[in-house]
Amino acid sequence: MTHSPTRRKLLIGFPLLAGAIVAPAAFAQNSSPLADIERRQGGRLGFYAIDTGTGRTLEHRAGERFLMCSTFKGMLAAQVLARVDAGKEQRERLVHYTAQDLIFTSPVTKANVARGALPVHTLCQAIVEQSDNTAAILLMRSVGGPAALTQFMRGIGDSVTRSDRYEPDSNRYSGVLDTTTPQAMATAARAVLLGDVLSLQSRAQLERWMIDCKPGLNRLRAVLPAGWQAADRPGTSVEEETNDYALVRPPGRAPLLVAAYYDAPGVSMDAREAVLREAGKVFVQWASASV
């Protein structure tokens, strides 16, 4: 992975002041509000954000591994789009399936099962916008399986993220299988959404799908100021994991990348999402302080 030569790590320490604009000097203390959130709420919070205009970063456990859950779906869609760009796949190619292929959380494939097939681009849209699990399985098979997604990640400069299993097994912890780090995922998102991994058309399409993503509305993007556009891809396991990463475009400045991964066994999803929103407020204050 590459980093801006102006990159500097920031440790921030001040009470969380809703809606405040904090001077940059306030981000140079000895404790982090992200660590404070973790201490108060329990669990393990991983966080990484980067301002692509300045190289400034905000980090907490940014290099620790977390289960990807459905955050892998954004990268899988990027891989399929890259194959389309390279002439190895066709957007309109029909992928056939039956009712026996359906698993839980598959709204698009379930609604269209009587048709017996859906186009590749519809399956991509389904996994990004609605986290359709059956569509993810069908697309994963089409690219060559989890190992092929890992290979794609290596090809875009990500030496950390790994895909090992299909849904739903990929949502269960087993060592390092199906894990990433907040820094790795945010950096990969930067590569596919802002870099030259995809054609301009494919980058715009992926970002549009992520803007229209429904499952992440109560996470990071829920606390962004009016006018800040966000394109995100969340991930969740029922038992413990609640994740989100996003490309954020504040008006009149360079884009921001942010990734938050929260592992809290036994805590309800509503409570876990509240932790991501709280972390998101810290992110907004940090980003606002750099203006």
Where are these regions (language model features)?
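Beta-lactamase-like hydrolase cores
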Residues: A26-L67
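Mid-domain, small-residue-enriched loop/turn segments at the edges of structured enzyme/sensor domains
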Residues: R44, I137-V197
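Soluble periplasmic/extracytoplasmic beta-strand elements of cell-envelope proteins
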Residues: G46-I50, E59, M75, H96, ...
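Active-site SXXK
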Residues: G55, L67-V95, V258
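Short, well-structured active-site flanking segments
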Residues: A82-D101, T150, S199-S202
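Conserved catalytic neighborhood of penicillin-recognizing serine enzymes
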Residues: L102-L138, P146
